[in-house]
Amino acid sequence: SGLRNVDYNVRTRLMGLADEWVSDVAAGTIDMVIQTRAAVGEELEVQRPASSAFSMLAFDNPRDKLNFKMNCSYCHQVGTLGFRTPEKPVDWETMLRRMDGFGGLYPHTQNTIIGRLMNTYKDDAVDKWPKFVPPPAPRGLATAATITMWEMDKPLEGSFHDLEIGRDGLVYAVNISRRRMIALDPTSGKQTAIEFPSHVHAPHSIETANDGSLWTTMCASGKMARYDIETGEFVVCGSAEAPRKRGNYPHTLRINPKDPEGLIWYTDAGSNSCFSLHPKTHVVKEYKLLSAGQAMGAGRGESRGITPYGLDYSPVDGMIWYSKLNGNRIGRINPDASDGDIREWNPPFRGPRRLHVAPDGMVWVPGFGSGVFGNFDPNTEKWTVYELPDAENQIPYALNVDKDGVVWICGTGNDTINRFDPVTETLVEF
């Protein structure tokens, strides 16, 4: 259904089975017989998800493992083939110091981590892993999904962070490492590369403004960029409050469609602040967030810094909600109060990351470090938390809530998407 009238190469794929291909299949073909066989040896091992590979890395206690997750799996999976490329101890040490400098790891972990990694992930160690046991075959709703994939941009040049559907129906995806975004027509598959101005770098997050333009955080440049989808013109302005010319690391942005001013709200992961930007005057207002001792429930952060991260607006009352990844907080800004009337709460898990507010006002938060997700009720200030399967090895980066209140969670550690129905409390993994 919906396919172009051409011949296709059809592949069958199921974890635990070897891939099988059938060539020259006409669109609309209904009856097709494909013989399958069990995957063995290397063809089975390559199906192992990162969460399983990460589970092979042993720690002395759950606290040490959590500390490692919070410091060494921010931007990539742990244990997959690309992660296992270092060969010698100095190569592993170079990689880890480049990523974190060991600054956030516990001292006793710093002293042992190179050996642990080599003993777990060097080639001959991998050969000694237990045989990978595939999960059961999908059933029910998980078998009804249709997933369409596109290879974005040039081969080996795609490092896409966020995407947004424009009012023209195109999908705009920002390539954080190449200073450009790709406009994809999901109907035809046509892609158009759009270069950002040469003086700004690292487009991170992208959102549609109330006038239909697209705003992007340029995290490495401390700037904000507006793209007019009708004229193709860019406008760039600083992300910090005057007189500063630039911010530290503008991160996630959101725009409330009910806001008559259309303010652009965003976090800055390199400071303890959130910001609002007027889309016409480009006036920036900084909201200095609370210190750790001022949070409801107090508690302690897990890593260095504070790291304001995810952000969203409430469709119920317009409040702005944000998370602090390393500070281990979520917070609320009242845009109608001159000082923001800022409040923060400590969640009962580690690593609140890119949150969203549901149509009913519930704040849904992924617990990146703990492998969970939960909701916070602003009225009762109570949490409800749900574990993902194999929670200790999962690293949910972000979630979203659709118009029906269904929660969709990134299975960052095992290449899945999870659908959670808050009414029935059922989780389906795709």
Predicted feature locations:
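Beta-rich, blade/repeat-based domains predominating
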Residues: 155-168, 199-211, 242-262, 292-317, ...
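Short loop/turn segments that connect beta-strands within beta-propeller blades
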Residues: 185-189, 228-232, 278-282, 334-338, ...
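C-terminal capping alpha-helices of c-type cytochrome domains
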Residues: 101-133, 169-171, 264, 320, ...
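The canonical Cys-X-X-Cys-His
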Residues: 68-79, 113
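Conserved beta-strand positions in repeat-built beta-propeller and related beta-rich domains
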Residues: 171-177, 215-221, 257, 264-270, ...
